[in-house]
């Protein structure tokens, strides 16, 4: 009986301590924060304008930066990656320290003013020079043969290396899927005699390595390809501000249909509500001056950006 009474007293005492502690917390521990109305503009994390990663000065509200890498820059010698140069030019240590994130695009063909290649010389030799040298309205350069099996295999290996280096610490939040076509935009100028892009079964082999190498990054494609719908991707438009091209992009998204580069009747899939789950990105068009885009035709530019449900917009870097 004495033991039961002692146990009861202990329980009562414990209960009183809990009640007292709760009362103390309610009086002294609970804090109420009242926020005042402000006209100050705040940046949304991982949204908004993404300047180039090599910019020395960026606004305090910037949380995203854009980094594109050519294969020639990354792997000048087979199996030897120039991480030091890539990191120095794109200030990756700085952005990590400042808590910022990157949009990454890997590119194999950027038309320029001089004859050049954006794939390394060793890869040009390994693929038996399969591809097309061009000098056309876009500029000069070299378009690889993306159907070439050596090209496909080496691409997978290099993307894996990119993932090992940049895909493990959250630095890269978005992948604007490049790899194929001029500027990595998944199209080539067929009228200039350049071989058309591969069909879906081959295009998918360029896409899958990215999903595996960057499992925590969100991937965006230039068009609503059927393979993109299957894997769940966002979309990007590199002609932002150019009304005709942007309206065509909207039509691809709303209707799907034929991919004109390969004449696949169902190469594109309607993805009209993609923005509800996935990002909408891209860059401002280079065919219109920034004064026209952001001054003369500002209302038109704003309306096109709103219609695209834009998540982020990058700088035209090259």
Give each language-model segment a name.
Residues 102-105, 172-178, 218-223:
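A structural signal for short, well-ordered beta-strand segments and their strand-loop junctions
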Residues 32-146, 270, 279-317:
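N-terminal substrate-binding region of glycoside hydrolase catalytic domains
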Residues 41-43, 185-254:
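Extended amphipathic alpha-helical segments with heptad-repeat/coiled-coil character used for oligomerization
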Residues 2-19, 26:
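N-terminal Sec-pathway targeting helices
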Residues 90-102, 123-176, 200-209, 213:
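An active-site-proximal structural segment forming one wall of the substrate-binding cleft
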Residues 224-228, 232-318:
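Substrate-binding cleft of secreted/luminal carbohydrate-active enzymes
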Residues 71, 108-110, 179-181, 225-227:
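Active-site-proximal loop/turn and secondary-structure-junction residues that shape catalytic pockets
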Residues 23-34:
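Sec-dependent signal peptide cleavage junction
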């Amino acid at each position: 009986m004495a033991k039961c009474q002692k146990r009861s007293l202990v329980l009562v005492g414990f209960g009183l301590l809990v009640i007292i502690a709760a009362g103390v917390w309610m009086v002294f521990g609970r804090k109420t924060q009242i926020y005042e109305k402000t006209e100050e503009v705040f940046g949304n994390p991982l949204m908004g304008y993404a300047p180039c990663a090599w910019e020395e000065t960026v606004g305090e509200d910037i949380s995203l930066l854009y980094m594109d890498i050519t294969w020639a820059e990354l792997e000048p010698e087979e199996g030897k990656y120039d991480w030091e140069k890539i990191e120095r030019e794109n200030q990756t240590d700085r952005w990590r320290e400042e808590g910022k994130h990157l949009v990454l695009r890997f590119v194999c063909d950027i038309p320029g003013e001089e004859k050049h290649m954006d794939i390394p010389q060793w890869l040009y030799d390994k693929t038996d020079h399969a591809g097309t040298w061009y000098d056309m309205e876009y500029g000069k350069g070299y378009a690889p043969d993306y159907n070439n099996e050596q090209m496909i295999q080496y691409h997978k290996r290099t993307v894996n290396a990119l993932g090992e280096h940049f895909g493990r610490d959250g630095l890269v939040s978005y992948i604007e899927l490049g790899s194929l076509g001029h500027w990595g935009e998944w199209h080539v100028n067929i009228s200039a005699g350049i071989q058309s892009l591969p069909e879906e079964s081959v295009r998918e082999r360029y896409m899958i390595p990215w999903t595996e190498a960057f499992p925590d990054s969100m991937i965006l494609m230039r068009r609503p390809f059927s393979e993109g719908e299957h894997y769940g991707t966002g979309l990007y438009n590199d002609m932002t501000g150019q009304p005709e091209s942007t309206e065509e992009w909207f039509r691809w998204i709303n209707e799907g249909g034929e991919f004109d580069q390969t004449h696949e009747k169902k190469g594109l899939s309607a993805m009209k509500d993609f923005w509800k789950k996935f990002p909408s990105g891209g860059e401002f068009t280079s065919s219109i001056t920034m004064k026209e885009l952001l001054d003369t035709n500002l209302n038109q530019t704003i309306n096109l950006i709103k219609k695209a449900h834009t998540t982020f917009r990058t700088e035209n870097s090259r």
